[in-house]
Amino acid sequence: MSSRKVHFVSLGCPKNRVDSEVMLGVARAAGFAHVDDAAEAEVIVVNTCGFIGEAKKESIDAIFEMAQHKEHGSCKRLVVAGCLSQRHPEELAREMPEVDHFLGSSDMLKLGRVLAGDAERMLVGNPAEWLIQAGDPRTLSTPGGSAYVKIAEGCNRTCSFCVIPDLRGAQRSRPIPDVVREVEQLAAAGVREINLISQDTIAYGRDAAGRSEGGARATLAQLVERVADVPGVRWVRLFYLYPETMTDDLVELLAGHPRVVPYVDMPLQHAADAMLRRMRRGHGGDRLRRVVSTLRERVPDLTFRTAFIVGHPGETDAEFEELCDFVRWAEFERVGVFRYSDEEASRSYELEGKVPARTAASRYRRLMTLQRRISHKKSAAMIGRELEVLVEGTSDEHEYVLMGRHAGQAPEIDGQVYLSGGEVRPGEMCRVRITQASDYDLVGELLDDEESGRGAGLPPAADLGAVTAKRRVALRVLQTDGRERQQN
């Protein structure tokens, strides 16, 4: 084992996690071993989130926490990367003399120069300079048999509240063959679930980078079908869809392809026409109702996850009530609610009618309470059903209880299925009968091979402990709500 050690802290979204995994791969290729304890590390890397005020604060707190190890630990070099340094490079460099190097949101591969000892302090480049490729080094940090795959970078939208285009640049789609090569590598290592992510997944292929050599435009449906056909892949899941163009062929894949899970992650942000105009979303509430109705009608057993913003400038009591009515009507399985963050670089920063923080907090609580009742009803309806579950590992609370997820539960955000009644390994797919339910989590009993029909169509599970021991590490992940998880 290498005597040179590195520790990573990753903040924010799954897209940032992939960037952290690339830097982990760069570090490993440079001869560094990853350690869970920051006090043991010669180099510490903090991959930051700079999307909203709360995320910026958590990133800054994490940086200062890690800086303590330069005084009291083994740390000789502290590196700050990601969206926060992309957004505020000069300010951070001035206010944080403890930091030795700054990398931006597209500078992951530059970590190699830092580790080699011949890099300048400021390495923040153009956010549109980099797009991940299958050949880039990467060390997985996700649990069990699951991995995220970035299919594009950047965004061309102009939503009022969002600064992502400034942080990540314009949309750049990966060619289908390159994405497929990466998925093939992951499947060969035992990964069963492929989670396709980008800033604007529905827009995949519309930019020049996504076109084939012949000039034909790649489509998201074409990509999804190719990924789902990779041997060893059991689930393909889509994140960050936009309610603009859900093509028939994409809906058909969600409805009928045996390896494309009937799961839609589509942040709708609001439902009132006036609010959607202020947010510059490009559609009204009627469009959203049509999209939801179409997906419910055409995709059997659909799980619909969405997100809303409350407290955006100009939001009235009546518009908030319209949003609540919409949520009651739609009965989404999963909803994330965010209080508006007034970011100076956003278009909404200049809008009048700022909503008091107390009002926004009250609306947040009301909408979450409403959705919690809906989610509990949806979870209770799962009792008695038999589901396919991807086993991820042992429960944090009970070492003798396994946990996993069914197709309607995305990694980290949608709850777990807690398992009893048998022995299975992380990365294995098994059949489970649900016996209990809470608002978000389920409890189930493993069915034996004969009862579940296991083995009739499911490939044998890879031993992830053996196959990916050299590629998978524990990554300290700080989510933007302040929760910390140790992912194995």
UniProtKB/Swiss-Prot annotation:
Residues noted as binding [4Fe-4S] cluster 1 in the record, renumbered to the chain: 13, 49, 83
Annotated GO biological process: tRNA modification
CDD domains (alphabetical): Radical_SAM
Cited Pfam families: Radical_SAM (PF04055), TRAM_2 (PF18693), UPF0004 (PF00919)
Domain Radical SAM core, residue spans: 141-377
Keywords: 4Fe-4S, Cytoplasm, Iron, Iron-sulfur, Metal-binding, S-adenosyl-L-methionine, Transferase
Compartments where found: Cytoplasm
Co-factor(s): [4Fe-4S] cluster
Binding site for [4Fe-4S] cluster 2: 155, 159, 162
Catalytic activity: L-aspartate(89)-[ribosomal protein uS12]-hydrogen + (sulfur carrier)-SH + AH2 + 2 S-adenosyl-L-methionine = 3-methylsulfanyl-L-aspartate(89)-[ribosomal protein uS12]-hydrogen + (sulfur carrier)-H + 5'-deoxyadenosine + L-methionine + A + S-adenosyl-L-homocysteine + 2 H(+)
Highest taxon listed in the record's lineage: Bacteria
GO cellular component: cytosol
Residue ranges constituting the MTTase N-terminal domain according to the UniProt record: 4-120
Enzyme class: transferase
GO molecular function, one term: aspartic acid methylthiotransferase activity
Cofactor note: Binds 2 [4Fe-4S] clusters. One cluster is coordinated with 3 cysteines and an exchangeable S-adenosyl-L-methionine.
UniProt KW 4Fe-4S keyword: yes
Gene3D superfamilies (UniProt xref): Methylthiotransferase, N-terminal domain, Nucleic acid-binding proteins, tm_1862 like domain
InterPro entries attached to this UniProt entry: Elp3/MiaA/NifB-like_rSAM, Methylthiotransferase, Methylthiotransferase_CS, Methylthiotransferase_N, Methylthiotransferase_N_sf, NA-bd_OB-fold, Ribosomal_uS12_MeSTrfase_RimO, rSAM
Enzyme Commission code(s) on record: 2.8.4.4
Residue ranges of every copy of the TRAM domain listed in the record: 380-448
NCBIfam families, alphabetized: 30S ribosomal protein S12 methylthiotransferase RimO, MiaB/RimO family radical SAM methylthiotransferase
Family: Belongs to the methylthiotransferase family. RimO subfamily.
Functional note: Catalyzes the methylthiolation of an aspartic acid residue of ribosomal protein uS12.
Protein name (Swiss-Prot/TrEMBL): Ribosomal protein uS12 methylthiotransferase RimO
Species assigned in the record: Sorangium cellulosum (strain So ce56)
